[in-house]
Amino acid sequence: MSVQLDPSALQKMAEVAAAAEQQSNEPMTVDEEYELWKSNVPMLYDFVSETRLTWPTLTVEWLPQKNLVAARTRQQLILGTHTSGEEQNYLKIGAVDLPVEVTENSKKDREIDEEDEDMVLSNVKIVKKFPHDGEITRARYMPQDDNIIATINGEGKIFIYDRSKNGVEALLSTLEYHTENGYGLAFNANEKYSLLSGSDDSNIALWDISNFEKNIKPTITFEDAHTDIINDVKWHSSEAHIFGSVSEDSTMKLFDKRSSQIIHNINTKKPYNTLAFSPFSSNLFAAAGTDNLVYLYDIRDVSNPLYAMTGHEDAVTAIEFDPNNDGILYSSGSDRRTIVWDLQEIGAEQTQDEIEDGPPEVLMIHAGHKTSINDIAVNPNINWLVASAEEDNIVQIWKCSSNIPRIGGEPEVDLSILD
């Protein structure tokens, strides 16, 4: 079967779904939507892998190295477990062996049969795991040394691991300050050993983990930084002293750690769940949450968002800028969707048919999950490769089709139309 992306593929999928609903006079079930998505995989993707884990993971992040193993590219991911107290929890390192062509952005057709193992069965395998105190709500590696991984659990305790070690030696430090569950955890890409955390206790803490002492206390704390649960914290991508937070109190705040002051206090109509700073523009950042919209902001004037992007049908749970492609943003949500946004297309003119398909900035909608998506990660080494983790133990790894012009380059001209 030749892998060709019909320019109207998304419209065709919508038409098929609409026809199925009209025929049954009832909305499609989640399983029916999944089967429809699966039938369109060869048309919409260069690669898809789905792995069912023993327990759900609330977190996923690609590790930066890649290795060539038996003519396949091996990439590793950070995963966690959430066993609800039924079994021991673990920090896990997963590995996936990708077909070499997945690392290329080739538009060449290739033959894929329905049982193509390269495309479908490159499952994530757990290659290393470390016992962990409680469920892992977030895990992130330190950019300056990817052997160092920080985790935070349901009690707000933070742990520092060295994944190059084994057994009890791998746990280097325990960081105690927060008193409740935490989802905010971020290393500073511009300052080694600098860690940021936020939790349900409404507090934010900054940590220096350089000594790897058994027990570490925060260097700076922001007591009652918010008046409700903190959903996320992130460092600015290029300014080492600036970070942001979002909260259930319907505020988003930007801080300067040099003065321990809030530099922007932004009131939002609904609580935001997540935020992200652009790696290409020092002024651009994004945030999203419970009103299903993805907002773009200019840090120089935060009085109003630059733009609000529509596409999700439920709360947005995670957003991430593409580290390889300027203007590309990913968002995932409780609607079981990950949307790939092309910010360069905002405001582009559309035909009536295109308007019915959705906003011009929607480049791709990944619709392969059956439950809410907990976290997403964009691969820093392989263009357009994404990992997404859902509530129902599933991790999917996928790469949009290189036949999509923005992904594979300018479309080739079909000279036959001139005959």
From Swiss-Prot:
SMART domains: WD40. Disulfide bonds: none annotated. Keywords: Chromatin regulator, Cytoplasm, Nucleus, Repeat, WD repeat. Residues 353-357 are annotated as: Interaction with the histone H4 N-terminus. GO terms for biological process: subtelomeric heterochromatin formation. It is found in: Cytoplasm; Nucleus. The record marks 284 as: Important for interaction with HAT1. SUPFAM superfamilies: WD40 repeat-like. It comes from the Eukaryota. GO terms for cellular component: chromosome, telomeric region; cytoplasm; histone acetyltransferase complex; nucleus. WD repeats lie at residues 131-171, 177-217, 225-265, 267-307, 311-351, 368-408. PROSITE patterns: WD_REPEATS_1, WD_REPEATS_2, WD_REPEATS_REGION. GO terms for molecular function: histone acetyltransferase activity; histone binding. Regulatory subunit of the histone acetylase B (HAT-B) complex. The complex acetylates Lys-12 of histone H4 which is required for telomeric silencing. Belongs to the WD repeat RBAP46/RBAP48/MSI1 family. PANTHER family: WD40 REPEAT FAMILY. Component of the HAT-B complex composed of at least HAT1 and HAT2. The HAT-B complex binds to histone H4 tail. This is Histone acetyltransferase type B subunit 2.
